[in-house]
């Protein structure tokens, strides 16, 4: 895990594009957690994590918090009759327990920007934090 301080402007970090350019992401790793920064454009398609097909709920063994900075996002937790849908606006957060199916989509015409926290750190997302991890390796 990183041992060096890391100061950056997240809007200037390299981003990975998903869903045909509808979403861009980058990440920063901490000891025990990963912060993912997401920029998403409005679309009818439900956006989810890497492990699920587009439009299908994501399920993973990590606790997750989504904090919405700008835009409006609809998040559905659970599936079928047990599903519950929430609307997030700037300043809202939602906690998603590990192994809970979830999917989200941007509402309205305005893009959304949010911060996701995954604990423990999602190693399958470390490639999004390569900008940080490369500096860490170079310092040792």
Segments the model singles out, each with a brief description of its role:
Residues 75-76, 96, 101-108:
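Short beta-strand His + acidic residue motifs that chelate non-heme Fe in jelly-roll/DSBH
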Residues 40, 59-75, 117:
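Short, conserved beta-strand element in jelly-roll/cupin
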Residues 1-39, 44-49, 55-56, 132-140:
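A short, N-terminal "cap"/entry segment at the start of jelly-roll beta-barrel domains
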Residues 103-140:
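Double-stranded beta-helix
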Residues 80-98:
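Short acidic-glycine-tyrosine-enriched beta hairpin
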Residues 45-48, 54-55, 71-77, 93-94:
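Short beta-strand segments in beta-sandwich/barrel cores
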Residues 34, 65, 72-74, 101, ...:
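Structural motif
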């Amino acid at each position: 895990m990183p041992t060096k301080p890391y100061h950056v402007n997240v809007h200037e970090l390299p981003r990975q594009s998903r869903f045909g350019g509808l979403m861009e992401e980058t990440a920063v790793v901490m000891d025990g957690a990963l912060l993912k920064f997401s920029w998403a454009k409005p679309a009818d398609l439900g956006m989810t994590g890497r492990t699920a097909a587009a439009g299908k709920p994501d399920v993973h063994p990590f606790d997750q918090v989504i904090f919405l900075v700008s835009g409006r996002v609809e998040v559905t937790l659970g599936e079928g009759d047990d599903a519950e849908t929430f609307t997030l606006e700037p300043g809202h957060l939602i906690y998603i327990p590990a192994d809970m199916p979830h999917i989200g989509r941007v509402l309205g015409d305005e893009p959304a920007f949010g911060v996701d926290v995954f604990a423990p750190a999602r190693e399958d997302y470390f490639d999004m934090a390569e900008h940080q991890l490369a500096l860490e390796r170079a310092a040792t």
